[in-house]
From Swiss-Prot:
Protein name, as recorded: Lipoprotein-releasing system ATP-binding protein LolD
Membrane topology: Peripheral membrane protein
Keyword ATP-binding in annotation: yes
Alphabetized PANTHER family for the sequence: IMPORT ATP-BINDING PROTEIN, LIPOPROTEIN-RELEASING SYSTEM ATP-BINDING PROTEIN LOLD
Gene this protein is translated from: lolD
Binding site for ATP: A42, P43, S44, G45, T46, G47, K48, S49
Taxonomic lineage: Bacteria, Pseudomonadati, Pseudomonadota, Alphaproteobacteria, Hyphomicrobiales
Originating species: Chelativorans sp. (strain BNC1)
Keyword annotations of the record: ATP-binding, Cell inner membrane, Cell membrane, Membrane, Nucleotide-binding, Translocase, Transport
Pfam families linked: ABC_tran
GO biological processes: lipoprotein localization to outer membrane; protein localization to outer membrane
Length: 229
């Protein structure tokens, strides 16, 4: 396995607004090692979501490269980028984006079925993940029947269902009250550590950020290491 599972090399991203060009990322470099949890702590509007979208191959940079598990992705066709993303990267967002017509276990099965697992295999793994997330008694409930914290734990289980190498999370506890946020982060941390994933987690919560292996921020379009707390 490469020494890094995710690397951004001199990544640029800008947006044109009328006659103005807004620079979001400028020669941004970042490396995520296997098994580490990194907090991305920065104010709103500084480019956290853009960085995560580029790192997760959801958005193309204007310059530089993203390397996933040793594979440079600059210049790859979109179908190849999608293949890498589905195999290597899981996503968790502030809002769960669960499919409302499906049960918890069906939501966790979905990415596995897309990846080619049989329904029986997908159901077994989904059940194991939900049990690990302490949702074993809630597998047949639809999202509307679950609390906000339960919904987010289902979303975390779904994100790791295909055993990715990298988990990218954009304010995963941002829509929750402090107590529930703590429970959800504990579940997220437990499954990341248990699975040996590498995780980059954007958060405003300094207390949660301090529990990760290191913290970075965005400054003038670049990724900057923050001192340990």
């Amino acid at each position: 396995m490469p020494t890094s599972v995710l690397e951004l090399k001199s990544v640029d991203r800008h947006y044109v607004q009328g006659q103005n060009t807004l620079t979001i990322l400028k020669a941004a470099d970042f490396t995520l090692a296997p098994g580490e949890m990194v907090a991305l702590v920065a104010p709103s509007g500084t480019g956290k979501s853009t960085l995560l979208h580029i790192a997760g191959l959801l958005e193309h940079p204007d310059g530089g490269d993203v390397i996933v598990n040793g594979q440079p992705c600059a210049g790859l066709a979109d179908d190849r980028r999608t293949e890498i993303r589905r195999k290597e990267i899981g996503f968790v967002y502030q809002f769960h984006h669960l499919l409302p017509e499906f049960t918890a276990i069906e939501n966790v099965m979905m990415p596995q079925l897309i990846a080619g697992l049989s329904p029986a295999e997908a159901r077994e793994r989904a059940g194991q993940l939900l049990a690990y997330m302490k949702l074993g008694s809630r597998t047949e409930h639809r999202p509307s029947e679950l609390s906000g914290g339960e919904q987010q734990r289902v979303a975390i289980a779904r994100a790791v269902a295909n055993a990715p190498l990298v988990l990218l999370a954009d304010e995963p506890t941002g829509n929750l009250d402090p107590v529930t946020a703590g429970y959800v982060f504990e579940a997220l941390e437990a499954i990341v550590r248990h699975s040996g994933l590498a995780a980059l987690i954007a958060t405003h919560n300094e207390e949660l950020a301090a529990r990760m292996d290191r913290r970075v921020t965005l400054s003038d379009g670049r990724v900057v290491e923050l001192p340990a707390k």
